[in-house]
């Protein structure tokens, strides 16, 4: 017998990570004119793998590098700008807006899939 969390799949975890990413992206956009502000983001794929328990790195050779960078610890990463500004700000508005739009669309998709999954579970519980 599987648990309720198992029935929801990765969509519940994806929603939490998408919300975190949305907060970082909106912070980047809000600080576009702040001198020396560094744009931040998360590696969504790595974070989702870590949250779902698939993020453990298996080394098969003693000479492999150890995994312990910021992304492995769930920290926000700094984004390198394509065209750095003179005031040290790394926010590129076009990039941030595009990333925000894509993240929002994917959030809505995960929410719709999660709603459909919950609806199916409710139907099964009611015996319809």
UniProtKB/Swiss-Prot annotation:
Q: Which domain of life is it from?
A: Bacteria
Q: Which GO terms describe its cellular component?
A: bacterial-type flagellum basal body, rod
Q: Which UniProt keywords apply?
A: Bacterial flagellum
**Main localization of the protein described in the UniProt heading:** other
- What InterPro entries does the entry give? Flagellar_basal_body_rod_CS, FlgB
Q: Which GO terms describe its biological process?
A: bacterial-type flagellum-dependent swarming motility
Q: Does the keyword Metal-binding apply?
A: no
Q: Where in the cell is it found?
A: Bacterial flagellum basal body
Q: Which NCBIfam families match?
A: FlgB (TIGR01396)
Entry-linked PANTHER family: FLAGELLAR BASAL BODY ROD PROTEIN FLGB, FLAGELLAR PROTEIN
Which function does this protein serve? Structural component of flagellum, the bacterial motility apparatus. Part of the rod structure of flagellar basal body.
The Swiss-Prot or TrEMBL record describes its family as follows:
Belongs to the flagella basal body rod proteins family.
| Description of how the protein assembles with itself and partners | The basal body constitutes a major portion of the flagellar organelle and consists of a number of rings mounted on a central rod. In Gram-negative bacteria, at least four rings, L, P, S and M are present, whereas Gram-positive bacteria lack the L and P rings. The rod consists of about 26 subunits of FlgG in the distal portion, and FlgB, FlgC and FlgF build up the proximal portion of the rod with about 6 subunits each.
Name of the protein: Flagellar basal body rod protein FlgB
Species name for this entry?
A: Cereibacter sphaeroides (strain ATCC 17023 / DSM 158 / JCM 6121 / CCUG 31486 / LMG 2827 / NBRC 12203 / NCIMB 8253 / ATH 2.4.1.) (Rhodobacter sphaeroides)
List the gene name: flgB
């Amino acid at each position: 017998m599987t648990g309720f969390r198992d029935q929801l799949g990765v969509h519940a975890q994806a929603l939490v990570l998408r919300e975190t990413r949305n907060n970082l992206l909106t912070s980047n956009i809000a600080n576009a004119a702040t001198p020396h502000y560094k744009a931040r983001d998360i590696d969504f794929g790595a974070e989702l793998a870590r949250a779902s328990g698939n993020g453990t790195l298996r080394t098969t050779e003693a000479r492999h590098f150890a995994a312990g960078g910021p992304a492995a610890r769930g920290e926000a990463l700094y984004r390198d700008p394509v065209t750095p500004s003179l005031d040290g700000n790394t926010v590129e508005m076009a990039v941030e807006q595009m990333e925000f739009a894509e993240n929002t669309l994917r959030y809505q998709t995960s929410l719709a899939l999660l709603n459909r999954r919950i609806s199916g579970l409710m139907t099964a519980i009611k015996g319809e």
